[in-house]
């Protein structure tokens, strides 16, 4: 185990590990590189790309989620302004929201958009296209509707496939743990 970078304290745990039949693996950072990038932005309703990046990065800068960090990196590459955010709130399993200037903006997943009545066929199609290609999505919305859908890609590590095959060969069934929807996963 130590040759693989694992520290397991106590022989009992090593002995018990040989009885494993299932293992849960987190996707981000375990099976993927854990450094998602913005692969595309679908602008909706005539939204301005730089303004969308500014709003999304302003919210993202308040959050430690890897997708937020990717949006902040993209905004910095495009020299979009990161603005102060007031009343920032993390919405577990949904996204984040806060007040920027005089308006409220949110970064939300599709379920959260549906829950708030903000989704549309166009928004759902953007999310579905991303998930069909194995990518994640997050939408930027204001009080009037969805401004953009960010498509995020996180590269699979080079040794992931062989590692999963080795687990299966040992009779261990790997399970994927992720916040993504099933198709993206």
Regions found by a protein language model. Give the residues of each.
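Juxtamembrane helix-loop transition segments at the membrane interface in multi-pass membrane proteins
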Residues: 1-11
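Cytosolic catalytic headpiece
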Residues: 9-185
């Amino acid at each position: 185990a130590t040759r693989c970078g694992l520290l397991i304290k106590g022989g009992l745990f090593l002995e018990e590990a040989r009885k494993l039949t299932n293992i849960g693996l987190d996707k981000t950072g375990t099976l993927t590189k854990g450094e998602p990038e913005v692969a595309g932005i679908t602008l909706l309703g005539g939204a301005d790309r730089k303004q969308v990046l500014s709003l999304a990065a302003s919210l993202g800068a308040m959050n430690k989620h890897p997708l937020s960090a990717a949006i902040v990196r993209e905004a910095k590459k495009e020299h979009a302004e990161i603005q102060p955010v007031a009343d920032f709130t993390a919405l577990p399993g949904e996204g984040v929201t806060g007040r920027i200037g005089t308006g409220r903006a949110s970064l939300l997943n599709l379920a959260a958009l549906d829950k708030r009545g903000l989704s549309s066929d166009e928004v759902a199609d953007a999310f579905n296209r991303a998930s069909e290609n194995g990518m994640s999505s997050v939408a930027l919305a204001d009080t009037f509707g969805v401004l953009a859908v960010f498509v995020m890609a996180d590269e699979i590590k080079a040794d992931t496939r062989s590692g999963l095959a080795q687990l299966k060969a040992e009779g261990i069934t790997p399970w994927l743990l992720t916040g993504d929807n099933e198709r993206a996963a």
